[in-house]
């Protein structure tokens, strides 16, 4: 069994090769450890390497693909159109709270290096909003899936109820 997390970006921001390099650098791996297995033009899978952490990474370009490219966002209270997503499949047999925090730290690293308007959807209920112009990362009110230490380390602020509507 698994849980999926999706980092959905309003524009294409990273190639599969760049994502492999970022995974290697962030997790201290050699470049050979992050060679993707291409599934199609729109899905690139990086897997197996992250077994100790407990997740697989999917680099998915959904533009023109089988997905609509629109996410119904609770934090924005409207649809969020996206061009690209990086998806994480977490193994439920592992330490899910720890894995969620590791993935959030990696996504924040990606955002700092490749700023883009984006949403991170977690467990079908929690969302983080990434704002390109301001550089802010905001967490949906009432979210409880990340540790306070990770939120502080990533510079994430919790939105007040009703905030985030654009």
Q: Language-model features: where?
A:
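Non-membrane alpha-helical secondary structure
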Residues: 11, 15, 52, 102, ...
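Hydrophobic beta-strand residues in large extracellular and virion-surface proteins
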Residues: 23, 58, 86-88, 103, ...
């Amino acid at each position: 069994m698994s849980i999926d997390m999706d980092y959905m970006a309003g524009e294409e921001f990273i190639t599969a090769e760049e994502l492999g390099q970022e995974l290697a650098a962030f997790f201290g791996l050699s470049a050979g450890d992050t060679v993707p297995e291409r599934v199609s033009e729109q899905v690139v899978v990086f897997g197996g390497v992250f077994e100790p952490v407990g997740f697989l990474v999917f680099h998915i370009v959904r533009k023109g693909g089988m997905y609509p490219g629109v996410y119904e966002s609770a934090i924005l209270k409207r649809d969020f159109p996206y061009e690209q997503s990086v998806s994480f499949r977490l193994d439920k047999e592992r330490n899910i709270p720890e894995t969620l925090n590791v993935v959030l730290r990696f996504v924040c690293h990606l955002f700092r290096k490749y700023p883009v308007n984006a949403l991170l959807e977690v467990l079908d209920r929690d969302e983080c909003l990434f704002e390109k112009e301001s550089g802010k990362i905001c967490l949906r009110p009432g979210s409880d899936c990340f540790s306070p230490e990770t939120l502080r380390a990533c510079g994430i602020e919790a939105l007040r109820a009703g905030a985030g509507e654009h």
